[in-house]
Swiss-Prot record:
Xref: Pfam families: C1-set (PF07654)
The protein's name in its UniProt record: Beta-2-microglobulin
Subunit structure: Heterodimer of an alpha chain and a beta chain. Beta-2-microglobulin is the beta-chain of major histocompatibility complex class I molecules.
Residue ranges occupied by any Ig-like C1-type domain in the UniProt entry: 25-114
Matching InterPro entries: B2Microglobulin, Ig-like_dom, Ig-like_dom_sf, Ig-like_fold, Ig/MHC_CS, Ig_C1-set, MHC/Immunoglobulin
Species for this entry: Macaca fascicularis
Record's subcellular location: Secreted
Gene symbol of the encoding locus: B2M
Disulfide bonding pattern of the chain: C45-C100
GO cellular component: extracellular region; MHC class I protein complex
A biological-process GO annotation: immune response
Main location: secreted
Amino acid sequence: MSPSVALAVLALLSLSGLEAIQRTPKIQVYSRHPPENGKPNFLNCYVSGFHPSDIEVDLLKNGEKMGKVEHSDLSFSKDWSFYLLYYTEFTPNEKDEYACRVNHVTLSGPRTVKWDRDM
């Protein structure tokens, strides 16, 4: 076998090994600034440490998807796991509940993490 063919086979084997790795996402929900009722803020959902890259993330207000949600570009860490930041402007108050819902192949179903205004 020529050296270039051997190198190509080795590269394909190493890439296929990367696809076999699955890592469950870590989900963190927090506000950009300390929350004050009636004062505009940003709700953030930072999802990290997951593999493969295909993932669904929704920000929720009282269980319903929020509009005008933006997100960072998909990025990866040194260990080849991925991370993303989803965020939207919101105005906290005492009655509304906010959360982040994530669905990934490593989860048995969507996982919802509530925003804790005291964190």
